[in-house]
A protein has these predicted regions:
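Short, intrinsically disordered, charge-balanced linker/junction segments flanking boundaries
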Residues: 1-4, 230-232
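Solvent-exposed coil/turn segments that connect beta secondary-structure elements
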Residues: 3, 16, 23-25, 35, ...
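Right-handed parallel beta-helix/beta-spiral solenoid domain characteristic of secreted/periplasmic
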Residues: 5-7, 17-60
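Extracellular beta-strand/beta-solenoid scaffold signature
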Residues: 8, 33-43, 58-65, 86-96, ...
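All-beta strand scaffolds that present successive hydrophobic residues in beta-strands
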Residues: 15, 19-22, 46-52, 72-75, ...
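Extracellular beta-rich repeat passengers
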Residues: 66, 76, 106, 151-153, ...
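Extended, compositionally simple hydrophobic/Ser/Thr-rich segments
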Residues: 72-77, 84-85, 101-107, 115-118, ...
Length: 232
């Protein structure tokens, strides 16, 4: 239902075929401002999962983590740390990992101390029509295959879009990502990632950063006012 719903403990779901639906991205708000237990806001390990039309705010750790799941749809979901860009914010806003057939559509991610929208060690991914602001990394595709990132707005992050393949993770060999039709503007927020995080090395003012990933296509994006480099 609509309203601000105060939640003090992490939620989890491990039953497949579930839809969690609110009434709107700014109407149904799960607030974890007074969270006392757990790290994530919502942790999902389930197939055929849909979450839509709601917001998750001010979690201690990751807002929405989806682990080892297949057929995931994240539609019109907002994750936000409402006090602005702080190193004490949770690392990830929308965070599918080791998953497949993932759609993120019309999402909003604000204030993550690592990545607003992060898809890691996953395959067959679409991130589209979404907005990422005031994160260290706006959108990050890491150690993943067959990802399309298109028609998104990334602005006021440290780095707008990152495509990485990192060592020492269970799944290696990131490749076949397409980044197109995105608006990547003014990603000049000072890096506020905690010391030791990989993204702590991303320079403020980065539009798109690609590292150690193969078969990447970048086309028909609009870049502007990224003070270090539009493409790195």
């Amino acid at each position: 239902p609509a309203g601000i719903h105060e939640i003090t403990r992490s939620l989890s779901l491990n039953v497949s075929g579930v839809t969690i639906a609110g009434t709107g991205i700014d109407e149904s708000i799960l607030s974890f401002k007074n969270q006392v237990q757990g790290a994530e806001g919502l942790l999902v390990s389930a197939n055929d999962f849909v979450i839509r039309d709601l917001a998750i705010e001010d979690t201690i750790g990751d807002a929405l983590k989806i682990n080892e799941s297949e057929n995931v749809r994240i539609l019109r979901v907002r994750t936000e740390w409402t006090n602005g860009p702080l190193s004490t914010n949770g690392a990830y806003g929308i965070y599918p990992v080791q998953s497949s057939n993932v759609l993120i559509d019309e999402a909003v991610a604000i204030g993550a101390s690592d990545a607003g929208i992060y898809v890691g060690q996953s395959s067959r991914i679409i991130v589209r029509n979404s907005r990422a602001e005031y994160n260290v990394a706006g959108i990050e595709i890491e150690n993943s295959t067959f990802a399309d990132v298109h028609d998104n707005l990334t602005t006021n992050n440290t780095g707008g879009i990152l495509v990485f393949d990192l060592p020492n993770l269970p799944i290696q060999g990131g490749r076949n990502t397409r980044v197109y039709n995105n608006q990547i503007f003014a990603n000049n927020t000072d890096n506020f990632a905690p010391d030791g995080n990989i993204v702590a090395s991303v320079p403020a003012g980065t539009g798109l950063m690609i590292m150690a990933n193969d078969n990447i296509e970048v086309f028909e994006n609009n870049f502007g006012n990224n003070n270090s480099a539009n493409i790195l």
